[in-house]
Amino acid sequence: METTTLPAREWANEKQHLADTLQIVRSERQKLENDLGIVDGNDRLIQVLDDGSTDAEVQQFVIRNKLRSLHQLRLSSRQPYFARLDFMPDPGAPVLGHLKAGEKSSIYLGRWGVLETPSYQVRVADWRSPVANLYYSGQIGRVSYEAPDGRVEGELSLKRMFTISDGQLEDMQDTGLAGQEKYLTDALSQMTSARLREVVTTIQAEQNTVIRFDAFSPLCVQG
């Protein structure tokens, strides 16, 4: 259901990027399933989880983390991300990870991060990462966000929002504030459950500020 007026070339590029991302998600999921013994049965996994020895406690911690990652990858196979940012940090900016100062990068945001092993390249950035502030609070043009090593300033040239369902790209739109309001309205109208299942895709600037507020400082919310 291609309802936006973006060029066909953009649709083709985004569909290919989605297909490549889903292939990475499937590959990472398969590695975890094989590592956990899920493909060949759960006997070894259950035996370790039931063992009460000290060594087993360490293994249990590792296994539970892997199970959590596996659960996230399974959900990501239906919707790996919901937005894209094109951002160029200023030269000398204290950026981390896959961003490079002075170079424009496309950043895809999802409910969870997706790393491609063994290179550990960031394919999808977690919505809680510092750079995701640009999606919730930034407008096209000069922007900044707080990173662990200091403030990162630069140029935001694109904010694109996606509707992806069961691994299929259904809609996308490039947006500033007005477009984001429309996306919020459309997303909420499609919620058939009383529970907002995809709330991270519809957070607005003021809500984002509250979510990221220092947990050890007082905060008063009115209304």
Model feature map: region roles:
Residues 218:
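Walker A (P-loop) ATP-phosphate-binding motif of ABC ATPase nucleotide-binding domains
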Residues 1-200, 204, 208-213:
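Extended, charged low-complexity regulatory segments
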Residues 221-222:
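Hydrophobic anchor at the beta1->P-loop junction of P-loop NTPases
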